[in-house]
Amino acid sequence: TVLDLSGFDTGKVTTMINMFYGCNSLTTLDVSKFNTSEVRDMLSMFQDCKKLQNIDLSNFDTSKVTNMHNMFYNCKSLTALDLSGFDTGKVTRMGYMFDGCNSLTSLDVSNFDTSKLTSMVNMFNGCNSLTSLDVSNFDTSNVTDMKYMFNGCNSLTSLNVSNFDTSKVMNMNGMFQGCKSLSMLDVSNFDTSEVTDMSKMFEGCHSLTTLDVSGFNTSKVTKMERIFFNCGLLTTLDVSK
């Protein structure tokens, strides 16, 4: 349950892929002395560390990292994660990054530079203890996949995606599926001109009373099954265009 890495010199390490993958009995992990200034890949670094309750990454230098896919996937016991100091300017992949982190009550990604990201698939999928999540400054101008991005975030009471640039997004399948505590959601500015899949996009959004999708361009959409399924409180829905 304990791993002593205090003597590790990581100054020349360029990849930390799968470094702690499957260490599912670790409860604590001290990587505060890690020098990550040369690391370019953190794919699945902490994946399936199911009992890890906290981790201090405040000293991580991520300025050269391009891949954070699956980084904290299935870290079921993490309750808080402060990544406000992460430099993500070169990262292109963040899919599944926090997928299955169902004990997280605090997650700070507000300073993420997402300008080079192409995939946000399943990024926050199953983060069902989060009551708030600030993604208002996310630059999504290069993202093509938002499938299940917020799926199962059933404790979120607010979510500001009004500034999302979705002009390149092709997949929105299940994007907000199961966000049952959201009482409002502004997607009125979404550019959906490239989207082909909207299946289950708002399925199970029980608390939404109004939803403006009147500006949605659905000319390329081939899948819409269950898009508003079980949106039981919707009293206003404009799909006239």
Give the location of each predicted region.
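Negatively charged
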Residues: 1-241
